[in-house]
Curated annotation (Swiss-Prot):
Residues 157-174 have a biased composition (Polar residues). It comes from the Eukaryota. This is Protein ATC1/LIC4. Its main location: cytoplasm. The gene is ATC1. It comes from Kluyveromyces lactis (strain ATCC 8585 / CBS 2359 / DSM 70799 / NBRC 1267 / NRRL Y-1140 / WM37).
Length: 283
């Protein structure tokens, strides 16, 4: 569609761009540049690239005037209306096209690269946080691996069916529970370390033992006294029981005597009545 152009022609017309990254309309030789800018704007608005020669010419103009474009995106000199934040003084076109100059501009870096390096340095200076994150990732990955292994073993045929199999269920269970065994062993080791580091409580000292012995002696003496008192009470109860039995016997004897006396009294009364009757009859 467009007429092919040589790179030397584009370089020859690069001097018509002023300091504001725009074409100098006062120059009489800027007709080619204005037409080129219109063509580029039309192509960019349409979103299609029609000719490779045109893109190569744009890239050449961008390299010829690097201080008017961004180093990270060559070929966009037509869309820039601002100068770069860090302009550099160039001695001439030949010095701008040298390899050292281009590499120096590329190695200058951008703000994104600086932010990335700062973040990387901060991460390197904080190994504990990285370790914690790594351990958390490992804890998340281990159960998932165990789940995959258990699912695989449930789906796979039993190995005991084959005559050449040497594995058994105990070995499989041991392989599956390696993480649990390791965690239990780790807790046991940590508990032993804590027991060694913690000082002995006051209950396990010699003073506490002596006080416990003295209290035990007092308890033994008090128990012996209680036993003696119990024996004394038992003897007194036995004596009171004997006396009670004796009194009961005496009470029985007294009752017998009273009954005998009552009977004698009745006999005497009867005898008195008989004698009084006889006396009355004689008179």
């Amino acid at each position: 569609m467009y007429q092919s152009m040589d790179l030397d022609d584009i370089k020859g017309h690069s001097h018509i761009i002023n300091e504001d990254a725009e074409f100098d309309k006062t120059d009489s030789d800027n007709t080619f540049a204005l037409e080129l800018q219109k063509i580029i704007q039309q192509e960019t608005n349409g979103g299609k690239v029609q000719d490779d020669v045109l893109a190569e010419a744009i890239a050449t103009v961008d390299v010829d005037l690097p201080y008017l474009s961004n180093v990270s995106s060559p070929g966009l000199v037509y869309g820039t209306n601002k100068q770069s934040e860090h302009p550099q003084s160039h001695g001439g076109k030949d010095s701008d096209l040298t390899v050292e100059h281009i590499l120096g501009d590329l190695q200058s870096g951008t703000e994104d690269d600086k932010e990335f390096t700062d973040r990387l340095n901060r991460l390197l200076c904080a190994p504990d946080s990285l370790k914690r994150g790594f351990s958390g990732d490992m804890e998340i990955d281990i159960p998932s691996n165990k789940k995959r292994k258990s699912v695989y073993e449930t789906l796979s045929p039993p190995e005991s069916m084959s005559p050449l199999s040497d594995k058994n269920d105990a070995q499989q269970n041991r392989d599956l529970n390696t993480h649990k065994d390791f965690s239990a062993m780790k807790r046991k080791i940590n508990s032993q370390r804590m027991l060694k580091q913690v000082p002995l409580p006051p209950k396990l000292t010699n003073e506490f033992t002596m006080t416990q012995v003295a209290e035990m002696k007092k308890r033994v003496i008090n128990t012996h006294k209680l036993i003696l008192n119990f024996n004394f009470l038992k003897d007194g109860y036995a004596r009171s029981c004997e006396e009670l039995s004796k009194t009961v016997v005496k009470l029985k004897d007294s009752e017998f005597d009273r009954a005998r006396l009552v009977k004698e009294n009745q006999d005497l009364k009867r005898m008195v009545l008989e004698m009084s009757k006889q006396l009355n009859e004689k008179q």
